[in-house]
A protein has these predicted regions:
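Residue(s) in the substrate-gating loop at a strand-loop-helix junction
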Residues: 146
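Alpha-helical segment proximal to the catalytic Tyr-Lys
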Residues: 131, 175-179, 238
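Active-site helix of classical SDR
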Residues: 126, 162, 170
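Canonical Rossmann dinucleotide-binding motif of NAD(H)/NADP(H)-dependent dehydrogenases/reductases
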Residues: 4-37
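Substrate-binding pocket helix/loop in short-chain dehydrogenase/reductase
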Residues: 102-103, 110-115, 210
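Active-site loop-to-helix junction immediately N-terminal to the catalytic Tyr of the SDR YXXXK motif
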Residues: 98, 106, 152-161, 172, ...
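C-terminal helical subdomain
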Residues: 186, 208-240, 247-249, 276-293
Length: 293
């Protein structure tokens, strides 16, 4: 256990705690000596997961059933947290859903459902847990957003719009609650392996082609996201608020390489990388061959 992050003894609540990212974030908190409040829809599973976490790491962990879009359930989770722990220091919002559709075909019901879970749910949990932080004069909020909040992924329906909303909500919370000692920040992942995406990356060609779009040439792991969350949730980031950390392996910096290059520049780049033993951009990535440029 490391105390560099100064998380030992803190009370850290995590929504979507049974998901890939949420579960890893809970484990990382516990590994750093924090007490953990696991929040998710399945009461039996979340209580069992909390018991396992407590037994493994010797910390205090509780699991509560909570639908982030239900004000009464959120308030009940807040009340239970205060009753059992006395306070809450950190809230991490990870719950989220995605519905694929072209905008002209997107049913209003899908729009409303994704908006409700991805944005309204983040607001409700932030507001209710945030009130306790304001009373205490300190607290840290971390919200899982996405690089797609800046550059939309087509046919992902309202997903990118909701995450852009999360970014601005976080800035609003940071601005309004900063005087009370409460900070709010986002983490923006790119391609990440989770149980939800396991089938997608089961095809090695999919993973290979996507990896080539990333500067580090690999798909992210949930541990990469958890590490960034730990920093923003810790006292080591006390002067950071209203901001976002991209955890995308440099994907956002590679846009220039996704376009055709004039003359022999693409051929030069490909030959240079090949001589260095580095993976080249592939046809599957959508980048034209040098001969096509």
């Amino acid at each position: 256990m490391s105390n560099w992050l100064k998380l030992e003894g803190d009370v850290c609540a995590v929504t979507g705690a049974l998901g890939g990212m949420g579960a890893e974030i809970c484990r990382e908190f516990a590994r750093n000596g924090a007490n953990v409040v696991m929040l998710d829809l399945d009461e039996e599973k979340v209580k069992a997961a909390a018991a396992d976490l407590a037994a493994e790491f010797g910390i205090h962990a509780e699991g509560y059933k909570m639908n982030a879009t239900d004000e009464a359930e959120v308030q009940a989770a807040v009340d239970a947290t205060i009753a059992n722990f006395g306070r809450v220091d950190v809230l991490v919002n990870t719950a989220g859903i995605l519905r694929f559709a072209a905008m002209e075909d997107l049913p209003l019901s899908d729009w409303e459902q994704v908006l409700n879970v991805n944005l309204t749910g983040y607001f409700i949990t932030s507001q209710r847990f945030g009130r306790e932080m304001i009373k205490a004069g300190q607290g840290r909020l971390v919200h899982i957003s996405t690089v797609a909040s800046h550059s939309p992924e087509t046919f992902s329906g309202v997903y990118s719009s909701t995450k852009a909303g999360v970014n601005m909500m976080s800035k609003m919370l940071a601005a309004e609650w900063g005087p009370y000692g409460v900070r709010s920040n986002c983490v923006e992942p790119c391609f990440v392996k989770t149980p939800m995406s396991a089938n997608f990356y089961a095809d090695p060609e999919v993973e290979k082609s996507r990896s080539r779009l990333i500067a580090t040439r690999r798909i992210g792991e949930v541990s990469d996201i958890a590490n960034a969350v730990m920093f923003l949730a810790s006292k080591r980031s006390d002067f950071t608020t209203g901001d976002a950390i991209k955890v995308d392996g440099g994907f956002s910096n590679m846009m220039g390489d996704l376009t055709a290059k004039p003359g022999g520049r693409r051929a030069y780049a490909d030959n240079f990388l090949k001589n260095k033993g580095v993976e080249l951009w592939s046809d599957e990535s959508g980048v034209a061959k040098p001969s096509d440029q």
